[in-house]
Amino acid sequence: MARGSGQLGGPHRDTVTMPKRGKRLKFRAHDACSGRVTVADYANSDPAVVRSGRVKKAVANAIQQEVKSLCGLEASQVPAEEALSGVGEPCDILDSSDEMDAQEESTQERSVSRKKKSKRHKEDPDGTGEEYPMDIWLLLASYIRPEDIVNFSLICKNAWTVTCTAAFWTRLYRRHYTLDASLPLRLRPESMEKLRCLRACVIRSLYHMYEPFAARISKNPAIPESTPSTLKNSKCLLFWCRKIVGNRQEPMWEFNFKFKKQSPRLKSKCMERLQPPIQYQDVHTNPDQDCCLLQVTTLNFIFIPIVMGMIFTLFTINVSTDMRHHRVRLVFQDSPVRGGQNLRSEQGVQVVLDPVHSVRLFDWWHPQYPFSLRA
């Protein structure tokens, strides 16, 4: 009995203490050497082997410290000083510590980026730039495409002034001129020596010689897909008609209405057009500025009332009664129509053209726009 009671009451000295289930193992920084790094420490390892699926930050910092020490770098330059300050001391690798480190790094990156931005803003507090001479802009203008002239002139005042000079437009004309170009008499090289209307003549010639501009006007259909709305409140300056004899047995009639669009400065009193320098006024003179031509071709002659000097207020294109052609209706008033004002059917002078073969709208730079040789 004594033997049995003694064995039951005494402690078991040779009992081995087992680790608790689920407890993480301790990580020692000196264990993370090049000889003990396994494939399981990297992101491409099997997730079944490594639960996290990525390299622990302390492992990466330890390897980084070892590499830098081998390269002769001081330990103070290693980013993870605090985690590896005591070599040989245990440090627990917890997910929460990784998240806190990531937050600290993101905070430091944001502070550094803010400092860089503040330095950039402090470099030029007045916002003043460097002004280049006019000759530099004139040299750069020699490499500008015709469709980029507007963007080039908006760079600065000197760039805009260059586009006002006669030298700029003369060089632009010579750059795109070819001997086989079919040009009207006013747009030929011997007539381009005149400074008056030089800019307008060069722009007109580009629609004959410059392929991108010529391709734009060649795509215009005989009947526009939508009714043009740019002619509203335009003034009719001139009207004429002529007989067209073609392949058809019966001739067609062409009715032309020359309009002058409303000037932008009339729409808003605060808006004023930028005027070129006085010495270049002749270069920018254009009698047909803001003008366009409405050309309507009909299958027979139609009587047209006098509409010159009146304001064009309504333009509609519908299907004709025979369902094979189109019908054009024009309405003219004595005064412009304000926004939102409705017109009655009996108001104004109405012009009805039916049946219509074609409807075309030409701006002043179009090759088919009639302009005076004295321009």
Curated annotation (Swiss-Prot):
Q: Which SUPFAM superfamilies match?
A: F-box domain
**Renumbered residue ranges of the record's region Disordered:** 1-21, 94-128
Major localization class = membrane
Subcellular location(s): the record lists:
Membrane
**Keywords of the record:** Membrane, Transmembrane, Transmembrane helix
Membrane topology field:
Single-pass membrane protein
Residues spanning the membrane:
299-319
Q: What's one GO-annotated cellular component?
A: membrane
The family line of this record is:
Belongs to the TMEM183 family.
- Name listed for the protein in its UniProt record: Transmembrane protein 183
